[in-house]
């Protein structure tokens, strides 16, 4: 069907940009202005994600690497950016207009030629496209010391296979070793050519409900990461696959809705790391009751466009383990696995279908390094790749009894890489293997081992099945949504009730606190009143005692005064006896008055100093004792 005639589809996603690019670092000039900077997903170049219409700033000259092509030059002459413009790096359009038209027509032809039938669960079941296993070889551009290698297409081969041949001459004979694969890409090949011939059918099958896996295998520095991620001008397999997947979703003519989620992890020194979540907790490999191998906890994020995928991958690549090696300035030191989950919902049949695409960038095998950390990393990398080779060899032998390889125990658990790829390698996913090689003479052994690995992978078992549709998921989801809304209303009601009760409780607590304060204050007042009453009672007793004492003292004073008066009278009488009667008579009146005055003066209270008062008290006391 034509894309122009298809009706709008409710995908549940933001409409993706067509044929957008995956963000990467392109080859650029070195600081000296010559040479080239190898591609690196972690190179700290700034990018502008918000504006894709600004053309890239370039120099007018065309440069090549004067020191020979690097692992990521791939024999292509690049237009390099002029110095000082890296911080203004923006992304240009991915394809020329003619390529856009070609891709659109190609997709329309695929839609019109692929037969479909509706299964019992309401899903349209597309015929499987391509073969179960696709093996491809990519030759890195030659630096120097080229070995004796050749490649080409087999003539009259019904499968359209291609060969790569090594010819070794000795003094007595010529030895020729030939390997056959689905595709052999020469040094002049482009990333899009590789994607179109080796990966595109896998992506289409994923859209149709099958699982697929694409992984790059090869020696360090042969262009695995370049092939998988690409550069700004030449996007790799991952961005091209995401572009195609979103394009298929956008042009789908059914009423199905789609969701695309991705996870991204790395295996470094046999430790799994969630690159998206980037938490301290190490994810663990778990196997459920149905035999499915999963990683938990692992972050899966919803993406709505290729641009979002680009940004997520770029942020993850910035923290991925890389280091300089003898072959490459930026070399991946870990296996990276990007998993894409396509969730397809049929609202009519109330079914859902989940298919997955795994994009694996394996760390490169290498010889032992003198650097301690690189040597340790290399040991883990080589061990996992050796286990992968053993697993593939024994799976191939089990699937093809005619092979002489050992088909004994399959050591999936000896490496976390093979444990994660267990289901895919055992035939449940369509496999596309891209083996990258270098045909330089000093890499002959590594190249031969890589070709043997890819040859064995062609014999892996195939039991590819379409993902099952889960029935009534949509209806159950609608029911759950309804229950969720009801629960939300109840939660809102109870939340308001709790708020009101909380307010009432606070008011009650305030009132109780006030009563407690009043009670505490009343208790204090009562205690003070009792204390005052006790003190008052004590004072009353003291006052009564003082009054009694005062009364006693007054009686003593009266007695003393009376005694003094009696003494004065006695003295006066004695005086009268001594003087003549005449004088006595003459002075009677005056003497009486004087005695009266003297008595009056004695009755007056004298205010004396303390010591005199004490002396007087003592004399009074003595006199009182005498009187008594």
Swiss-Prot record:
It comes from the Eukaryota. Residues 588-628 are annotated as: Disordered. It is found in: Cytoplasm, Cytoskeleton. Its main location: cytoplasm. Residues 2-122 are annotated as: Interaction with mal3. The modification Phosphoserine is found at residue 82. Residues 589-602 have a biased composition (Polar residues). Residues 132-460 form the Kinesin motor domain. One of its GO terms (biological process) is protein transport along microtubule to cell tip. Residues 603-620 have a biased composition (Basic and acidic residues). Residues 530-557 form a coiled coil. SMART domains: KISc. GO terms for molecular function: ATP binding; ATP hydrolysis activity; microtubule binding; microtubule plus-end binding; plus-end-directed microtubule motor activity. It holds the Pfam family Kinesin. InterPro entries: Kinesin-like_fam, Kinesin_motor_CS, Kinesin_motor_dom, Kinesin_motor_dom_sf, P-loop_NTPase. Keywords: ATP-binding, Coiled coil, Cytoplasm, Cytoskeleton, Hydrolase, Microtubule, Motor protein, Nucleotide-binding, Phosphoprotein. One of its GO terms (cellular component) is cell cortex of cell tip. ATP binds at residues 218-225. Belongs to the TRAFAC class myosin-kinesin ATPase superfamily. Kinesin family. Promotes microtubule growth, possibly through interactions with the microtubule end, and is important for establishing and maintaining polarized growth along the long axis of the cell. Acts as a kinesin motor protein that moves along microtubules and is required for proper localization of tea1 and tip1 to the cell tips and microtubules, respectively. ATPase activity stimulated via interaction with mal3. Interacts with mal3 and tip1. This is Kinesin-like protein tea2. It comes from Schizosaccharomyces pombe (strain 972 / ATCC 24843). The lineage of its organism: Eukaryota, Fungi, Dikarya, Ascomycota, Taphrinomycotina. The gene is tea2.
């Amino acid at each position: 069907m034509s894309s122009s005639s298809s009706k709008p589809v409710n995908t549940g996603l933001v409409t993706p940009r067509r044929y957008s690019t995956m963000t990467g670092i392109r080859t650029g000039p070195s600081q000296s202005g010559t040479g080239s900077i190898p591609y690196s997903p972690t190179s700290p170049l700034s990018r502008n994600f918000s504006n894709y219409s600004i053309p890239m700033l370039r120099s007018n000259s065309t440069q090549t690497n004067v020191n020979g092509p690097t692992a990521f030059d791939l024999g292509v002459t690049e237009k390099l950016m002029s110095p000082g413009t890296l911080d203004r790096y923006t992304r240009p359009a991915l394809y020329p207009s003619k390529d856009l038209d070609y891709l659109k027509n190609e997709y329309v032809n695929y839609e019109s030629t692929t037969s479909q039938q509706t299964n019992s669960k309401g899903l349209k079941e597309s015929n499987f496209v391509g073969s179960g296993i696709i093996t491809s070889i990519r030759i890195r551009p030659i630096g120097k010391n080229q070995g004796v290698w050749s490649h080409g297409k087999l003539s009259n081969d019904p499968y359209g296979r291609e060969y790569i041949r090594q010819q070794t001459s000795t003094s007595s004979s010529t030895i020729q070793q030939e390997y056959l694969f689905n595709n052999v890409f020469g040094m002049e090949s482009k990333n899009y050519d590789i994607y179109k011939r080796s990966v595109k059918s896998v992506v289409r099958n994923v859209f149709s409900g099958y699982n697929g896996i694409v992984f790059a295998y090869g020696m360090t520095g042969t262009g695995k990461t370049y092939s998988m991620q690409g550069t700004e001008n030449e996007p790799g397999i991952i961005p091209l696959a995401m572009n195609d997947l979103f394009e298929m979703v956008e042009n789908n003519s059914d009423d199905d809705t789609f969701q695309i989620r991705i996870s991204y992890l790395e295996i470094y020194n046999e430790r799994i790391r969630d690159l998206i979540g980037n938490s301290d907790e190490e994810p663990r490999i778990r196997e459920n009751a149905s035999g499915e191998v999963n990683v938990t906890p692992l972050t899966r994020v919803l993406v709505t466009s290729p641009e979002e995928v680009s940004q997520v991958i770029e942020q993850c690549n910035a923290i991925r383990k890389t280091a300089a090696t003898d072959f490459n300035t930026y070399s991946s030191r870990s296996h990276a696995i990007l998993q894409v989950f396509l969730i397809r919902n049929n609202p009519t049949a109330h079914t859902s279908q989940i298919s997955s695409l795994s994009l694996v960038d394996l760390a490169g095998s290498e010889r032992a390094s003198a650097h301690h950390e690189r040597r340790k990393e290399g040991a883990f990398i080589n061990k996992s790749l050796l286990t992968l080779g053993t697993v593939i060899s024994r799976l191939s032998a089990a699937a093809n009894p005619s092979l002489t390889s050992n088909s004994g125990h399959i050591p999936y658990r000896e490496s976390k890489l093979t444990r994660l790829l267990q289901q895919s390698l055992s035939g449940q996913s369509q496999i596309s293997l891209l083996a990258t090689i270098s045909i330089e003479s000093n890499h002959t052994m590594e190249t031969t081992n890589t070709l043997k690995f890819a040859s064995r992978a062609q014999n892996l078992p195939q039991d590819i099945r379409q993902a099952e549709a889960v029935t009534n998921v949509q209806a159950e989801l609608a029911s759950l949504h309804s229950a969720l809304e009801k629960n939300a209303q109840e939660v809102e009601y109870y939340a308001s009730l709790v708020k009101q009760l909380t307010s009432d409780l606070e008011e009650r607590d305030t009132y109780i606190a006030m009563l407690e304060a009043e009670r505490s204050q009343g208790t204090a007042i009562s205690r003070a009143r009792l204390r005052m009453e006790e003190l008052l009672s004590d004072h009353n007793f003291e006052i009564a005692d003082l009054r009694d004492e005062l009364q006693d003292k007054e009686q003593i004073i009266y007695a003393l005064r009376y005694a003094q008066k009696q003494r004065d009278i006695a003295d006066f009488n004695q005086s009268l006896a001594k003087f003549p009667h005449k004088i006595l008579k003459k002075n009677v009146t005056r003497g009486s008055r004087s005695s009266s005055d003297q008595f009056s003066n004695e009755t007056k209270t004298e205010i004396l100093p303390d010591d005199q008062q004490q002396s007087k008290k003592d004399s009074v006391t003595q006199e009182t004792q005498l009187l008594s």
